[in-house]
């Protein structure tokens, strides 16, 4: 069950994303549509190449919404073999691999 806080956070995150996605971060809309279509979403190190691995998306804006409501649901929907293939395809660094392992 989703907590009331989580529902509110998701609601406001979507509103922020809707306002800013077309101007400042157009990939938000594109990636949300890919997620809904069941397609592959580029990883954080490709979308936000200057972000540190410890970042975790806590920037309280569109990048937080992207990580927590678009990319992580995509990532968590992959099985172990699909995750390994995805990481190989996107040339994951050791630091990002460790970060993702901690999220399992």
Segments and roles (model prediction):
Residues 2-104:
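Polar/charged low-complexity regulatory segments
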């Amino acid at each position: 069950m989703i907590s009331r806080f989580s529902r509110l956070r998701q609601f406001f995150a979507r509103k922020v994303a809707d306002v800013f996605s077309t101007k400042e971060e157009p990939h938000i809309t594109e990636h949300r549509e890919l997620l809904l279509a069941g397609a592959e979403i580029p990883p954080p190190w490709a979308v936000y190449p200057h972000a540190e691995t410890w970042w975790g998306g806590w920037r309280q804006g569109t990048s937080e919404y992207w990580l927590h409501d678009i990319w992580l649901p995509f990532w968590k929907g992959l099985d172990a073999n699909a995750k390994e293939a995805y990481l190989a395809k996107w040339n994951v660094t050791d630091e990002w691999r460790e970060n993702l392992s901690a999220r399992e």
